[in-house]
Every structure is written in structure tokens, then in C-alpha cells.
Amino acid sequence: MKILSTIWATLSDLFYNSVFQVNLEFGEDDMCGVLGLVSHEPVNQLLYDGLQMLQHRGQDAAGIVTAEGSTFHMHKGKGMVREVFRTRNMRDLIGNAGIAHVRYPTAGNAGSSAEAQPFYVSSPFGIVLAHNGNLTNTAELYENVCNKHLRHVNTSSDSEVLLNVFAHELRREVSKNANPHRLNIDNIFNAVAEVHRLVRGAYGVVAMIAGYGMLAFRDPYGIRPLVLGSQTDEAGRKSYAVASESVAFNALAYDLERDIQPGEAVFVGFDGTLIARQCSDRAKLSPCLFEYV
């Protein structure tokens, strides 16, 4: 047994060091929980209940953003879900779509309320993003984002860097349009494809683009999990959910549809239309072993 334990410890160390080698100047959110919903009814309580089911994935901080038309409403802070969200906070989270996050920090950002997710950028269109995983080339990405593309990163979180990488690529795609002030689905998926090309490491992402819809995507190796669920109401209208684990759907009375595939992106418009596309030519499932412990 001692020999087996030693072998397991060695393999675990090798796996972690090869896949999750990080720059400790940046905060890395290793095993966090993400959740996203597009519904035909208010989602604030659903997001809260779903986060409670994901609480085991992160106890350091929690956050929710809802979308009311093209307006975002956000509340986030340090602590457990029940500590961060009071009745007055929940009342302010208006809208039929939203994303949420619970954080379990592993380096750099423990104790920082500023690095609670989701993160927000105003351009292009207004984007909020929550991320589970950790990036291995954060320093390089930060250099490009801040010094080359002149974007501002306010924290040491690799998730904020990831958001700015996506935002820059989306802006670049939209600028090619005949009408550079309007977004189309190809712009979104092409931007995700560029994220896959540029970013190294693990990421399961949920995001919202103001006035358009919710986006979810998974790194080309599927290191972190991401699942798709749905619910059909009595009128035949379908609502969609994305989460780090299907256990979140239990609290929502949503059905598990499938895993989001490595390299795949799923976009759900605020009208309830779902479109999915493979955005990587190197997709290969290599999940994190620790997700099964």
C-alpha cells in the first residue's frame, strides 16, 4: 500500500506540474464552479440555488450577474453563497438570464474580494465572464492585452486576463463586418477559436454579451468540465443552463442534455435560440484527474 501511495503521489505531482504549471504573479482559480442560465422567468433565485449546489467547488467568494435587456446587474463578494447574497442583493438581480461563480483560489488571490467573479468589460458591447480553471501562459497574455492592445486589467486574476483576450478578439472580428456596430454568430465563434489558439491551460467559461446572449466554451482538451441542461415549460418554451457539474441542475429542475465537448462553444440568445459549434481543430478529451476524486 505504501508503494502504491508513493506511485500515486508521484503521478499526481507530475500531472499537476505538466498541466497546471502557473505563473504565481497571477491568481489562479483552480477548481471553481460556474453556472449560466437563459430562461423565460427571473433567474436570480435559480442562480442562487444552483450556486448552493456548487458550493463544494469554492467557498472563498461568490458572484452573480443578471441581464435585463442590455443592462447588467451584479453582486459579488467574499464568503459562502449564503453570506454574500442577502435579500436586498437578490432583489436587485433583475433579469431572465444570468451567470454565476463560486471561487476556490489556489495561489495569489486568496482573501481578495476584488478578484471575485464574474468580471466585466465595457467594450465591445459589454461582456461579463466567469471562469473555472487556470491558464499556463498568463504572463504572455497579460503582456499582449495590456501593452500591445492597450486594454486594462485591474486585478492579478488570470480570469480577467482571459476576459480581455476574448473581448479583444471579438472586437477584431466585429470590425470586419459591413456594419461594425452589430454582432453576428460567426464573430462570436471566430473569437472563441482565437482564444483557443492563443490561450494555454484549463478553462470552462460562461459569459454574457449585453443585448445578445449567453456564451459557454471549454478548452480544447476538456480539462475542466462543462455541461448543458434544459427545461421546457408548459407553453413549450425551452430554457437552457450551463454548469460545471450537473448536480446544479437538481436544484433547478433542469434536465441534463450533454457535456459541452472539448473546444466546443455554445451560444444561447436571449430569445432562447441555441447554436453550438466546434471551435478548435485540436480538440482531444484529456480531463483533469482531480475532477473524479
Feature locations, PLM:
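Conserved short alpha-helical segments that host acidic/polar catalytic motifs at enzyme active sites
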Residues: 7, 11, 15, 20-293
